[in-house]
């Protein structure tokens, strides 16, 4: 019985590791994309750079932004809003990654 349990645990750990690999790579890609496309106005930590604050860039760590739906954030990234340019040329999975990354910036 113990041998079966050991095999099940080993398989489960290996499976979890394999599943985590693409997610980690995706998270790294989203982080790099955020730094290249968003951090200029929103800063690396999401609180807003000096220039971004002057232009009205949102602080991604606030409850207001974190309370937006994924669809709302996706729409803003895709189509722009106010002074924020649109990024509709990004792939859907890149935009989804940015939304997920923004979620990690909450206070």
Regions found by a protein language model. Name each.
Residues 71-81, 85:
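Periplasmic c-type cytochrome electron-transfer domains
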Residues 58-71, 86-94:
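Electron-transfer interface patches adjacent to heme c in soluble/periplasmic c-type cytochromes
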Residues 29, 45, 69-72:
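Hydrophobic alpha-helical segments typical of transmembrane helices
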Residues 38-41, 73, 98:
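Hydrophobic packing within well-folded, soluble alpha/beta domains
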